[in-house]
Amino acid sequence: MKKFGKVVVKLRIPILVLSFLLLIPSVLGYFNTRVNYDILYYLPSDIDTMQGQDILLDDFGKGAYAMVVVDGMNKSNVSKLVKKVEGVDHVASVISYSGVVGDDVPSEILPDKFRSYFENEDSGATLFAIFFDDTTSSDDTMKAIQEVRDVTDNQCYIAGMSAVVTDTKTMAEKETPFYVLVAVVLVCIVLAIFMDSFLVPVFFMLSIGMAIVYNLGSNYFLGEVSYITKALAAVLQLGVTLDYSIFLWHSYKEAKEETTDDHHEAMAVAIGNTLTSVVGSSITTVAGFIALCFMSFTLGLDLGVVMAKGVVLGVIGCVTILPSLILTFDKALEKTMHREIMPNFDKPARWIVNHSWIFLIIFVLLLGPAIYGYNNTKVYYDLSDTLPEKLNCSQANKMLAENFDGTNSIYMILADSNLSAEDSNAMMNEVNGLDGISFALSIDSALGGEIPTEMLPDSLVSELKGDEYQIMMVSTNYTIASDEINDQINKVDAIAKKYDAKSMVIGEAPCTKDLITITDKDFKTVSAVSIVAIFFIIFFVLKSISLPVILVAAIEFAIFVNMGIPYYTGTTIPFISSVVIGTIQLGATVDYAILMTTRYKRERAAGNSKKEAISIALGTSIPSIIVSALGFFAATFGVGMIASVDMIASLCTLMARGAIISMFVVIFVLPSLFVLLDKVIIHTSLGFKPKKNSQN
């Protein structure tokens, strides 16, 4: 490893030149990487709801759809508005009152129930549906949503997933640069205070920043990334890989003091030591992210690949770019050195070790409530419900519910186009009889027997009936992702299949129901895979059977406490929190744990007694653990405070709190477990037994 360090030191200038040149293609790649704002897009392609979406697109030329509420406009002006909307690029069709019956049919002869589908006479609100010719999250659909708003002078409110995706994109694009800025500023403040140089945080940020740009730029080769991945990747990479930079700096200072005054030689030694120490902890972090790739909900694959790649690039940057920067600006660094405010922790470490029984009791007392809270914390799946109320899509959902019989969402049934009018009417009657249904209608049932179907325009019939399938609309009063709507969808699906075995229930609500079912299974798989992977990595790194169990148990305890707190505070968190936070907190905390355990092993092997070895390991590790944890906290806490997208804000808040909880667990609980289980550890591990007789 030292040979590699010498090569880096020798080639430091070419390394810096190359690293800056690589920023050019990386920046180009970053700006040309498409971002996907639709969470439901990541559902498996082989489930009914996703196959139904494909049929809708292939057979009807319709992908996304939206419900539009127009407030306080007369019928004539609504008709003009509809014609404007029909002229927007990528609008496949519009289904409206005038489109169904034409302008020549007197409204008085229409059934009151039919009119109520489109008009609320009391409030003056009018409803019509827009179908787009591309998928929910496509660039064309999002442009069409915005253009519809523009051509109607924002006189309409567009509800549905397409509108949510469009507004989320607008908001995320404005805020994401501020996430990075806030994270960098706060981390620099923490490092400037707790480290011994005012300038070194700048070089940390420059080195890590380059690795982040390389990572985000290389996402171009993935085709596209989720907006969640894009928003979190930079902040997470900063928080997770900061440890490596801190370790290199400390190793460099130690090498200068202990081995030589030759800064080049000291850096070569520091690079070698950093690689040796960081490889094990970085592999565990990468393993945690790779575990996300085992999800059938492929957002896990998206986030897992990007973050694993980011950790690898972070390690490479830490042992190439950062040493080159430090040596190049060594004199400037010397001039900005200041006294460390971090005290000596030898006495606190001895006190913790001598009073380990206190922390073991706390550990046991908190474990049960933490696990219970973790298993019972409420989560939400309907992302639109957490967006700011000022957004057009949020106002539209409210208008839809207030003006049209409490309607919260509209989904569809794809049924056989040759289904008889009798069966179609019977199916719709059964669906309309279910609790929580505002209306269910097909072409055959819409006008009942009072107006013959032949009176409908051929263009409308062709919009709703294809060669193989026909579209039936179902409006629900229930909230998306609620138990009530999921039960309702099951009943609607059963009714539809009674009349047509090949029918499918599709739309946002059915997709969200599938999301709940699939991710529940996925999260259990990821949790098991990540724990097993990290268990075996710790086993090989520390050459121990017992230590993987002890370390994983301590870290999982920290995760249970973090994820259990929302239950006791009555906070509802995003559905993906448990797997993302669990993976990240596990991967980040294991760095602290391995750092202290490695020193404990070295001191035990050197002949120190149990308590002396643990005290030395703890006392020397506490400063690094505190700085690293506070750095991660700073990187995520600020983003959690400013993010308007609740999913991003919640995830960052959980990560920030998790960093602090993990810090306390590693400082207080882990050494206490070492004290309790020292005999087990030294008899089930290689390299722990004292080389000479000493008191245990």
Residue ranges and their predicted role:
Residues 1-35, 41, 136-381, 497-696:
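Membrane-embedded transmembrane helical bundles of large multi-pass transporters/channels
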Residues 45-65, 70-162, 378, 384-547, ...:
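Structured non-transmembrane domains adjacent to transmembrane bundles in polytopic membrane proteins
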Residues 35-38, 102-104:
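Surface-exposed, low-hydrophobicity interaction/linker segments
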